[in-house]
């Protein structure tokens, strides 16, 4: 018996040694070992001194570039910049600003923020931070932001130029956490119709949305327009929380699946505050990822009408992998699928072709005409309630197509915008008339109804354009005139009030919003969906 156990032990030991040797042999011949040896050889044997960190970073970037367009590497600084808007706050002095002629112009101090508390006003120009001149020296916006931001409770000394005051005004601002809002606008767009615009899906989005929804319902809202145009996505959980507001209990919102990630399903809890009202969802070619999750769920359950243009088509699940130095790899581990089984992700034969997709879609006429878009039978799916046909193959195809309106966007208008003439002229007007306008228009509604951009203001805009190298074109000016008036009015509304009022004005030219309002005038809402069966 003793010999038998001893022999069995020898056999077990032998096989464990063989297994270990096999494992070691496998590692020694693995691609990972090959990479390690190459890096070791370069670091220790190369003729000149090398930057190992940079070499490794570039190797990681190259490797990820062979996979898909959304598997990426970010250095520690990029990780910080990427996370701030999604976390819902950052630490700084609390101002909205624009750069006007190499000078930081305060658009609005954040309500209740550190700058407002010490008396900094809209229209102030920050000239110095500590002892460093930042005005008129062509300092980059990123460099200025680095000087203004800092840890909570730290202090920064500013010198400010204020209209009507000769000397520079000194301010000491105690930095604090500053909220970053993901809702741009929330207002009653028409009797009983509310409007909410979400610019990203962040940690605070659901909380912001519920607050906005409750406020609109108190004002008598029965129907809702949810604007996701230009929304590039964000957190999956935020998208699920928003979709939950519209769907019934146990209705599937989205599922994910990948090679090493078994199917994972996310369902509505049935606790939403807007499960019954009429819903319009607006999307365009820049609506992506989390926006497409919400839109796909609404469409697949026939819960609302989708209006606009085919969305971007980003349906890859990224897992963030934190590296020891604070950098991060975002690795694609699965794909998103809508409740009907549609894959949101568009094809990616090569990264170059993928990056040119929107240009290709425009050149093929997809932005102008629904008839230019064709789907094979293999990409047709059925919705859950009404068995309508919806389409896969990348992005969400709207129920009602709205082409891009290019009639007002002339080359002259584009140059006024791109060269900064529109912004510079508007800064001049707001500087000269802020106090007068706030006295004349006691509320935004008064401003919205009565304010008009005058011929003198337009003449100043044209003159500013000429100063900045924009060649005047009478025909193109006349063609773009309605849009120029509206944009100028919207920018002034933003500076006198906030982004909510900006969108209240600028949305008058939004064709998708017009279409949604037109559809909501029809009493048979389900009929709108059945027409697209």
Name each model feature, range by range.
Residues 1-28:
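Bacterial Sec-dependent N-terminal signal peptides
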